[in-house]
């Protein structure tokens, strides 16, 4: 008997339905939310991702604000664009699309974003607020993972969650979300220095694979009935594949597909952050 699929697309559509109603209420009150994007260069993946975000905005009624810049811009020009969106009253929240060209300092650019307009929830100030448990925009992918688990009634409180990957966008902030009192999970954060990874994953009620190593998590590493969340993406000769080997589906209780699992929720919670910022005004 195969695992139950954690359907991120269906869950995203539920979120969009809720957001559409909330945006309509904000619009009626003269507070229409706006999502801004800063895209530097012509990377096809980044261009497609930004197009997708603005298509999502159209579905729920959020205003789109695009700033597309050539790859050879100066730091001063990028800073001016960030400052312009910081001051733009029509822009409720925005993101600087990564990666930036190598001559630009990504960390400096992200820190220049007004924390009150941080749609990604990854500004150092907002990550600090997450540590302290004070209200702030939450990182989109970790928030999507928690929502997906709850949507399928997978118990988080008291669960042992093994997170593979310590990146700033997923692994580290996910540990912070899962150890809040509202989630109350016990989290083991694994990385390249972890000894005997399979011994840890076999103990887990929930495994989150977020490293970008094709088919890293195999069936012999998973406890029967465990929930498995596949976040990482790798490009292979066969196309894009996740961190979770297909054989895991035969053993696990629940598995998120990749694509179609967490990715749609990352985009959904980007819009959710913008709507929540507008509602707090």
From Swiss-Prot:
GO terms for cellular component: cytosol; extracellular region; plasma membrane. Its EC number is 1.5.1.5, 3.5.4.9. InterPro entries: Aminoacid_DH-like_N_sf, NAD(P)-bd_dom_sf, THF_DH/CycHdrlase, THF_DH/CycHdrlase_cat_dom, THF_DH/CycHdrlase_NAD-bd_dom. One of its GO terms (biological process) is purine nucleotide biosynthetic process. The keyword GTP-binding does not apply. Pathway: One-carbon metabolism; tetrahydrofolate interconversion. It catalyses: (6R)-5,10-methylene-5,6,7,8-tetrahydrofolate + NADP(+) = (6R)-5,10-methenyltetrahydrofolate + NADPH; (6R)-5,10-methenyltetrahydrofolate + H2O = (6R)-10-formyltetrahydrofolate + H(+). NADP(+) binds at residues 165-167, 192, 233. GO terms for molecular function: methenyltetrahydrofolate cyclohydrolase activity; methylenetetrahydrofolate dehydrogenase (NADP+) activity. Keywords: Amino-acid biosynthesis, Histidine biosynthesis, Hydrolase, Methionine biosynthesis, Multifunctional enzyme, NADP, One-carbon metabolism, Oxidoreductase, Purine biosynthesis. CDD domains: NAD_bind_m-THF_DH_Cyclohyd. It comes from the Bacteria. Catalyzes the oxidation of 5,10-methylenetetrahydrofolate to 5,10-methenyltetrahydrofolate and then the hydrolysis of 5,10-methenyltetrahydrofolate to 10-formyltetrahydrofolate. Homodimer. This is Bifunctional protein FolD.
């Amino acid at each position: 008997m195969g695992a139950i699929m954690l359907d991120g697309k269906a869950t995203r559509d539920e979120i969009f339905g809720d957001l559409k109603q909330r945006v309509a209420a904000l619009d009626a009150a003269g507070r229409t939310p706006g999502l801004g994007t800063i895209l530097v260069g012509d990377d096809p993946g980044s261009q497609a991702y930004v197009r997708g975000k603005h298509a999502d905005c159209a579905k729920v009624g959020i205003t789109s604000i695009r700033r597309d810049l050539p790859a050879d811009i100066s730091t001063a020009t990028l800073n001016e664009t960030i400052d312009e969106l910081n001051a733009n009253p029509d822009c409720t929240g925005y993101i600087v699309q990564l990666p930036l060209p190598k001559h630009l300092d990504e960390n400096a650019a992200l820190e220049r974003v007004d924390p009150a307009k941080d749609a990604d929830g990854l500004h150092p100030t907002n990550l600090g607020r997450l540590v302290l448990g004070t209200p702030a925009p939450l990182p989109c992918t970790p928030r999507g993972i928690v929502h997906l688990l709850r949507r399928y009634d997978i118990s988080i409180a008291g669960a042992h969650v093994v997170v593979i990957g310590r990146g700033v966008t997923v692994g580290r902030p996910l540990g912070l979300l899962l150890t809040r009192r509202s989630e109350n999970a016990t989290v083991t954060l694994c990385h390249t220095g972890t000894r005997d990874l399979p011994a840890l994953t076999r103990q887990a009620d929930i495994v989150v694979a977020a490293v970008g190593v094709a088919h890293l998590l195999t069936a012999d590493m998973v406890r029967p009935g465990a929930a498995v969340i596949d976040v990482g993406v790798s490009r292979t000769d066969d196309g894009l594949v996740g961190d979770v080997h297909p054989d895991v589906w035969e053993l696990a209780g629940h598995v998120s597909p990749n694509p179609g699992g967490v990715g749609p929720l990352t985009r959904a919670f980007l819009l959710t952050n913008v709507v929540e910022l507008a509602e707090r005004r």
